[in-house]
Amino acid sequence: MSEDHVNKLTADIFKALAHPVRIKILQMLKKRTYCVCEMMEIMDVEQSNLSQHLNILKKQGLIDSEKAGQRVNYHIVHPCVAELIEVAEKLIGE
């Protein structure tokens, strides 16, 4: 894979992270799996809005979902995603 291609893919990941709602989703998912209904309650966002944010994160391979009956549960795909959020929090002193 060329360096330019890797740089574009890296930029795409950072674009996916570039929204406070998506950061909040990842902060929640680094603790445990959540379904959409739980996230809606905690975050006070509309389902359509939340679904758009989840799809952006999923498209970049940062999260994945698993159907459990009527529920769709989301989780972080790789521990380094949580580590990336933690590094950003350290940079701002949180």
Where are these regions (language model features)?
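Short, intrinsically disordered or compositionally biased N-terminal tails of bacterial proteins
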Residues: 1-6
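N-terminal helix-turn-helix DNA-binding core of bacterial DNA-binding proteins
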Residues: 8-48, 61, 68-79
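Short, intrinsically disordered/low-complexity patches at protein termini
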Residues: 48-50, 59-60, 87-89
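Residues within the DNA-recognition helix of helix-turn-helix
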Residues: 53
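Alpha-helical DNA-recognition elements
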Residues: 56
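Conserved segment of winged-helix/HTH DNA-binding domains
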Residues: 73-94
